[in-house]
Amino acid sequence: MEYVPKILVDADACPVKAEIKQVAEQFQLEVIFVASFNHYSVNTNGENWIFVDTGKESADMRMMNIANKGDIIVTQDIGLASILLAKGTYVFSNRGELYREEEMSLMLDIRYRHAKERQQGKYSKGPKAMSDQDRSLFKDRITTFLQNK
């Protein structure tokens, strides 16, 4: 029997949960949202949520433990993305960018340099706010990926 991938979502700060649910319904894929207890809600609307303790890497560790080759991951955490790519998963950013292993070294280096600059008091602007166009682009990209898979 062929493995049916699931969608794992690093849900603490994910702005495209609704779009992920729509795509999952369209392709009949299971979605698992992983978040810290800080984001706990009794109203999960029948969705599959896993809540973990509030430790720094708790959600990341849980995602690493339940991800399988072929699964689709949505995260904006580049460190987590690099680890999950090595497991043979497909990792998307919240903006629909499909991460690639060959880009990870450079992306991790840039993240490190930005962290050093912030420590030195050189603050850069964060990412721009998500627009409806960004949400639509995310949905289009992940839909196209699944159609071609």
UniProtKB/Swiss-Prot annotation:
InterPro entries in alphabetical order: UPF0178
Pfam families the record matches: DUF188
Domain of life where this protein originates: Bacteria
UniProt cross-references to CDD domains, sorted A to Z: PIN_YqxD-like
Family: Belongs to the UPF0178 family.
Alphabetical list of NCBIfam families matching this protein: PRK00124.1
Name of the protein: UPF0178 protein lwe1471
Organism from which the protein derives: Listeria welshimeri serovar 6b (strain ATCC 35897 / DSM 20650 / CCUG 15529 / CIP 8149 / NCTC 11857 / SLCC 5334 / V8)
